[in-house]
Amino acid sequence: MESKAIIEEVKTKPRKESTSSSSSTSTSSSIEEDKTNHLIIDKNTIDIEYQKLKHNSEDNFEKFVSEIEEVKVIPKKSRTCCNNHKNEHNYLLEDEDRNIEEIVTSKGFNFEKHFVKTEDGYTLALFRIPGGKNCEDGSKLPPVLLQHGIFDSADGWVCNGEKHSIAFVLANHNFDVWLSNSRGNKYCKKHDKYRTNSFEFWQFSFHELGIYDIPAVIKYIRNENKSGEKIIYFGHSQGTSLMFSGIVEKYDFYKNNIKLFVALAPIARLNHLGSTLLSILSDISLHKLMSKVEAYEVCPQSDGTSNFMNFMNQNLNGLTNFFIGLVSDDNSKECNDQNALSVYLKHFPCGTSLKCLIHYVQIIKEKKFIYFDYKKDANFALYHQKNPPEYDLSKIKDIPIMLITGEKDKLSTPDDVRWLYNKLKANVIYLDIVPNMGHLSFMCGNNFSWFKEPLEYIIDEFYPK
């Protein structure tokens, strides 16, 4: 990818009309359309009058666009609604008591378990869906890696039914799909030296995931996949934070191994946080509070937690929606399908380290995308300065990036994504702020039509016929 000053700036192109073709690159059979106007931005140039935006987009989008220098945008084309979404969700409860392998194989896909050792001694579980249904060998298909967010696991990518889960849709479009798990979640509690009840085991934040976990996983995938293709990386939430930090720290490695970085609900700076719960947590000394009881793990998965959350969802759905609104989504109605939530909540939360949470609290307090703050003396030893430095996002070059967030996301807010875009815009080839979408909507939302456009874009731009 050329790295000029945005080449000709980020502009728009009209998307291709979907056809009834049964080709593996057609998205029409898997993702239906809605009638919402999006703002889509990419580098392909075409002369389109900017005045159309003023008449067709909502005020908040006009504000968003007006502050992006010299960018021309148009409203996304009209789309028809996902009419069969509720019909599919009638069958979702069958997945409620299934593990991830059972969910995948019950839909006719093959499933593989792999284990990867990191440089610093952790053993990670890595799952694979090698192409479409009954595909025995996905080794020559283009590889895709999906990395979950905080408190989540690989399960999150398959909990929303075959037609509305990113992992299944990509597999059905003949990608070799790999699902990674972060150290410390329910699948990754083994270390060469430390036990899971030790302080040392839990000394990691998203920073370590970006410099140890994902590089180990990528090396493993490229060895198993024989296509010779670089990897398309999808990250959700923390899955984007670790990639931003990882590229800054290990630029050459990622440049040589990543074909495209798709950032869903990207998290870097958190200056416009709308989450009431996280705002409260940022004012509490979590480290002191939890260290007193030697709590190094946060929100581990347990039958009690899963059963309680599922009971609340089935019997007190309004309370579930309230909690979702409190934490992450300003429009909880977008992910209020009880069947979909029941499946997702059976697999969530899956645990992470206290240090991960503290790192985000520090970012909230400092209003900067900073390295972990170990306090004065340790910072001097590690960073050679009193305060932790910011991650230098200007080091991210020549890696194509797609930024996609929701208009109603309280964590990955449009304002913070705008800041991120301006930091990365020489690399950003696609930008979408999806109306009515929140943070959890990417994993268990009612409407999946948002994925049609980016999937078409990926296929058209990176795998043209």
Give the residues covered by each predicted segment.
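Short alpha-helix in the alpha/beta-hydrolase fold that links the catalytic acid
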Residues: 413-422
